[in-house]
Amino acid sequence: QRKKSATGYSFVMMIMVMLGCSVSAGAVTKNNADTEYQKGNYQQAIRDYEEILNNYGVSAEVYYNLGNAYYRTDNITKAVLNYERAHLLSPGDEDISFNLQFARSKTIDKITPESEMFFVTWWKALVNLTSVDCWAKTGIIAIIMALVLVLVYLFGSHIVLRKIGFFGGIFFVAVFLLSNLFAYQQRQMLINRTGAIIIAPSVNVKKTPAKTSVDLFLLHEGTRVDITDKAMKGWREIKVGDG
C-alpha cells in the first residue's frame, strides 16, 4: 500500500511539475519582448509587451518599451498613448518625459500648453520627482529613522547625541509627512485622471453636444486633451492644452 501511495504521489508531483514547466514555457517574459525589440522584430515585441501588460498588470517600464516599439513602427499615436501611460505611473522618469515630448512633436496638432505660475510648476515637479511606491517607501524609512532618533534623544548619554536625536527626529518626521503628502497627491492624480489621447485620424470638435452643431476646430490623432465633463452619454466636453 505504501509503495502504491508513494508511486501515486510521485506521479501527481510529476504532472504538477510538467504543468508548471508548460505554463512557464508558454508565458512571455519581458526578456523575450526585449530580445524581439533588439532584433528589430517590433511587431512581435508589441504583441509580447501587450501580453505582459494583460497578464501581469501595468508597469511604467513595459509601457515605455511598448511606446518605443510603436514609435519604431511609425505609429506615433500609440507611441504617445503608451508614453503617457508610463509617465502617469512614473512622472519623475527623465527618459519617459523626453520620449513623450519628442513623440508629441511628431503629431499634427502643435498645441502649446497653458502657462502656469512658477511655484505651481515647482510643486508639481517636486511631487512627481518619483513614483507613488517610492514616496511610500521613503515615508516608511523616514518614520523608522525618526523613531530611532527619538530613542537616541530620550536615552542618549551625551548632549551632542541628544541634540542629533532631537533635530534629526524633527527632520525625518517632516520627510515622513511630505512623502505621504506627495504619495497621496500622486495617487489622487492617478485615480482622478482626466487626460485622453485622440486615437481616431481626426475629430471635429463641436460647439454643443449635437451632431448638427457648428464645428469649432479639428483635432488629429495623437493629440492630448483633458476631459472636463462626461455627463452626457456619447459626448465629452474637452479642454486642449492651450485652453
Explain the meaning of each model-derived region.
Residues 115-155:
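Membrane-embedded alpha-helical segments of integral membrane proteins
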